């Protein structure tokens, strides 16, 4: 469960290291975002000499949360960190690599490009 002011790790090589959520895209007054939701975030920590810089406002899709994810089959998935992937306006990832495991639920939200470059899909 991600809400405004939550800090997230970045799970790609776009140049950002840490993000802070500032808005959840979707409904006007949604309090929490879950896996597959798009957020507006500000970059709090970045790699030097890359395309993304600190204090830049970006869009990101949430790919891992510490709050457990329940599937229809009864399986529960829980991650060790909150992580997101930086995307552009069309929903394509800005980085060319993805780090860590990515849940299968992103397919139903239309993020198939992220799933295709992910090393492990759960």
UniProtKB/Swiss-Prot annotation:
Q: Write out the function statement from the record.
A: Binds to 23S rRNA.
Gene label? rpl14
- Record has Repeat as a keyword: no
Membrane-spanning parts = none
Q: Which GO terms describe its molecular function?
A: large ribosomal subunit rRNA binding; structural constituent of ribosome
Return the GO cellular component terms, semicolon-separated. chloroplast; cytosolic large ribosomal subunit
- Kindly state the subunit structure of this protein: Part of the 50S ribosomal subunit.
| Name of the protein this chain belongs to | Large ribosomal subunit protein uL14c
Q: Which HAMAP family match?
A: Ribosomal_uL14
Q: Which SUPFAM superfamilies match?
A: Ribosomal protein L14 (SSF50193)
- Predominant cellular place of this UniProt entry's protein: plastid
Q: Which keywords fit this entry according to its UniProt record? A: Chloroplast, Plastid, Ribonucleoprotein, Ribosomal protein, RNA-binding, rRNA-binding
Top-rank lineage group of the source organism = Eukaryota
Member of which family?
Belongs to the universal ribosomal protein uL14 family.
NCBIfam families found in the cross-reference section: rplN_bact
InterPro entries per UniProt: Ribosomal_uL14 (IPR000218), Ribosomal_uL14_bac-type (IPR005745), Ribosomal_uL14_sf (IPR036853)
Starting at the broadest rank, the lineage of the source organism is: Eukaryota, Viridiplantae, Streptophyta, Embryophyta, Tracheophyta
Q: Which CDD domains match?
A: Ribosomal_uL14 (cd00337)
Extract one GO BP annotation from the record.
translation
Places the protein is found? Plastid, Chloroplast
Source species: Jasminum nudiflorum (Winter jasmine)
